[in-house]
């Protein structure tokens, strides 16, 4: 049930505080909510399910890009051993300085030369979405359907709202009382073995999400 959570501090000695102002070393955490959940076990509709990301490091390259490096394991609830794999994901930053990680790990096709331009027309379509909400136990979070329409309509299962693309690879989703800040970029879909539009972001209550485009609107 490993996962990666984030707190921040102005001092390396702490205290490290999460999105809601809670100390990461607080004695009580009955609902498993302390720490901004950056990554947990996950499964897209196609491909391998993964669990237990952890033992991470953060890298910062000469081009100013940030990366999360961690171990992770393929889903295995048997008594047989399962070796760890390594994933590297780019880190993006919210307007107020909180990190959220890319929806897919880096692939051999990622050159590191920069993010390709993306238009609003390219973004519209059907998606799979994973919402990284804290849970007890954390377990494996599965993807659900999502839609971004040309007129700004947003749909995620029964949730309806609006979305907008503000260019410079940034966008916004709003529904109910929530606003989600998102980054938009082209990347490799590890499950479908193709390049696609990927989204990642952070909700106004500190819940991160991933999404990947899987098809055109009818």
What does each of the following model-derived ranges do?
Residues 1-218:
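Carbohydrate-active catalytic/glycan-binding domains of CAZyme proteins
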């Amino acid at each position: 049930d490993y996962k990666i959570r984030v707190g921040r501090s102005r001092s390396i000695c702490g205290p490290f505080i999460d999105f809601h102002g809670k100390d990461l070393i607080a004695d009580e955490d009955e609902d498993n909510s302390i720490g901004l959940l950056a990554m947990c076990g996950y499964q897209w509709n196609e491909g391998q399910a993964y669990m237990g990301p952890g033992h991470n490091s953060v890298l910062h390259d000469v081009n100013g890009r940030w990366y999360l490096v961690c171990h992770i394991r393929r889903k295995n609830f048997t008594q047989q051993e399962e070796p760890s794999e390594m994933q590297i994901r780019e880190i993006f930053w919210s307007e107020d300085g909180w990190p959220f990680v890319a929806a897919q790990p880096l692939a051999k096709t990622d050159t590191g030369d920069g993010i390709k331009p993306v238009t609003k027309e390219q973004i519209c379509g059907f998606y799979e979405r994973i919402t990284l909400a804290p849970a007890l136990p954390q377990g494996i979070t599965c993807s659900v359907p999502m839609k971004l329409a040309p007129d700004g309509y947003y749909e995620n299962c029964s949730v309806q709202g609006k979305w907008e693309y503000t260019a410079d690879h940034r966008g916004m989703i709003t529904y109910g009382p929530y606003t989600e800040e998102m980054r938009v970029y082209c990347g490799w879909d590890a499950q479908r073995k193709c390049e696609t539009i990927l989204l990642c972001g952070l909700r106004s209550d500190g819940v991160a999400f991933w999404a990947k485009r899987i098809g055109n609107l009818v």
